[in-house]
Amino acid sequence: MKIPDLKSVILGKPKEQINNDSTESLVPVKSISDGIIQLNNGKYVTVLEVLPLNFYLKSELEQKNIISGFAAWLKISPSRLQIVAQTRPADIDAFCERLEDYYNSEANENCRRMIFEDAQLVNYIAQNQAVTRRFYIVLPYEGGSAEMSAICDEMSDTVNTARQYLEACGLETVTHTNEDIFLYELLCGFLRPSLKGIKPTQIPEDIRDALSPDSADMTHRDYTVTEGEYRSYLYLSAGGYPSSAGLAWAAPFAEAGGGITAVFYLERKSREQIIPKIGNAAVFNRSRIQEVGDTRSDYEQLDDAIESALFMKSQINREGEDFYYINTLMSVSADNLDDLKRREKETVNLCGSMGFTARRADYMQDKAFLSLLPLLEIDRDIAHKSRRNILT
């Protein structure tokens, strides 16, 4: 009798490197039209781009107004949202080409040397400091119609409402000349890193083929390689959040540096659905704590759980706050494995310095790859490991 390999039994057989003929499995997109993405599972989403805002330069009153305005929108927004904060090294190609033209046309040797030194400085800053930040909110279609016209009308209303509330609290949204091309270019940034800097002029007829990476290696435990770009995926564990956080607690994730993408999944639960669960949990933990000695370690855990339940119930009933589940995922990208590991360590340390516990999605990198796409689709296993309840 042949004895099976224990590693294969526990972890499964090694995944094969995905080549150009099979990478369509990484593209859950069926079509893009009318500013809407249709997914393979029949769902529809759209993406709203929001311009960056330096929150720290605002006065205390302005900061509170921004937070309260955003919270007001969350009360009437779709019950499920995805917020994407993407940072990339600044694109300096056009500027460098202009400097090169100046350099070639300059006759004075001293001026040529100054232009060359400027080019070196710009290149250094771009590699080490300069980044571009882009923010997106992914909105779902929550209606029940199968008619595309009705879907478009409802999605348009959802986007317009979001624009109205966000701009009322000081956040400027972007209206693109062609929303379909914007969505296609956005997805290319996640699925086709080799096309970075190439501006599409139209939507390809076969959208899945156009979005399919030329190569994708998902065989590694702790990273992936897509068209030569190395990526590692992290998540904040469910118990890895501090008990309380101040204003703009998530801002450092968006400022972590080039090659870092932070994704936040939000799911609102109705009061009618969540209040009974919170009450039952408090009653259950109260009955358990009576059987536990106050010197045992789990006594403190039960006492904290009871206090948290009572606090949430009070805030929901008396302060009008909403109950949400949040999942925080991050991807780290680099041109080589050494830089990837360095950036990954820096990101984990950043999270730890703020009281968060970041874990790498080992043996789930392929699932994390799909969960980071701006399509409001998170893997069930990753969602379970990273889900945390919060209040607005």
Locate each region found by the language model.
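Extended, folded cores of ATP/NTP-driven motor/assembly subunits in large transport
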Residues: K2-T392
